[in-house]
């Protein structure tokens, strides 16, 4: 089966809804998107692994590898989108539409369009004997729980030299990305007496020092 061109790939990806949400009534799987990517990447001689998420058989990550050895370059993105209300769109969100020199559709920018571009760029390497691999990685649930990325990170299977993430950044390459880290601090005081306050330790005062 011949590989579709970039716009045709984008059109097919956008036509498949893959909303992820913490609300079960609107949450969807991403397997159909993963299977599309897998079929195209196999045409380019990538070795493709589809990795179902634990307790979510309708969702999966994908790791596609071209070449051999250690290191290499990862092109990474997510296959899910945020929820959408079709009534708020000027165009059908599940149909790729070109208007005013722009492409409209659910996921054109964030971020199904990235996979069409990455696969198109990989065509020129499909018959190369590369000493370091090119990997294309697709994850699930980035827009909700990050379960896809969490499971992939926990597996420890990605040890590339470089990673490029195709999230939209206003057409300006950036070398960092925001994240989130949560920590908890516990302080325990000890009782004292007004006759000798030095015997005590006030946890409230200690927390004031930490926060301030």
Where do the language-model regions lie?
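Acidic/His- and Gly-rich active-site-bordering loop/insert found
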Residues: 1-104, 127-130
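Histidine-centered active-site/metal-ligand motif
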Residues: 78, 177, 193-194
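Acidic-glycine-rich active-site phosphate/pyrophosphate-binding loop
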Residues: 84-99, 160, 175-186
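Glycine/serine-rich anion-binding loops at beta->alpha junctions
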Residues: 101-117, 193
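Acidic/histidine-rich catalytic neighborhood of metal-dependent amide-processing enzymes
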Residues: 111-182
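Acidic-enriched catalytic cores of C-N bond-cleaving enzymes acting on peptides and small amides
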Residues: 194-212
